[in-house]
Amino acid sequence: MKDWTNYQNKTYGDDACKLIIDFLDKYKVDSAIDLGCGSGNETVYMVKNGIKVLAIDRQLNQDFILNRLSDSEKQLISFNESSFEDVELPKTKLLTAFFSIPFCNPNNFDELWTKIYNSIEDNGYFVGQLFGDRDAWNVVESINTFSIDKVKEYLKNYNIIKLEEIEYVRESDNKKWHFYDIIAQKKVCDKHE
């Protein structure tokens, strides 16, 4: 298991991902799951916007989140320390996964994606990222990367609100990034199928 402590320390207190900020500017939800919450920046942002959040991470640092919340805001947060491979997901209106689920064991990714789908209520939302197949990490066997066609296949039971392909080289370490920003609304199931 990779130790995420350094990453969490490095990203603690960063601004929330623009994707969740943009989403919450347009859509209202009352509950969310932040899957792979890391240092909790998006979790804190959602709670501060009045959303009840279940924060899940395999290496959960609750203090990183709780230290940034008022006593009343702390009533909106719950935690679950679990790996992607073992996680159980309750029903929710919004499931977020910011640069997290590509780190699921590749042998378990399809199962995780099914759990995510089953967790999201009809007309609920998935907001997050998947790594593209031209990302520098595409050669790392333990990391999931996807072609645009594969991403669209994963989203076939969703109405795609945003699917933006982003590709650049980060100057600080010359790492090639290729990922997809996703906002998708789960289609209503036809009970007669």
Residue locations for each model-derived region?
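Class I (Rossmann-like) S-adenosyl-L-methionine-dependent methyltransferase catalytic domain
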Residues: 1-28, 38-88, 107-111, 125-193
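Conserved acidic residues
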Residues: 30, 93
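Conserved beta-strand/loop positions that form the S-adenosyl-L-methionine
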Residues: 35
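A conserved beta-strand element that flanks and buttresses the S-adenosyl-L-methionine
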Residues: 96
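Short catalytic micro-motifs in class I SAM-dependent methyltransferases
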Residues: 99-100
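ABC ATPase nucleotide-binding domain "signature" loop
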Residues: 103
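A short glycine-rich, Lys/Arg-flanked "PGG" loop and its adjoining helix->strand segment in the class I
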Residues: 110-122
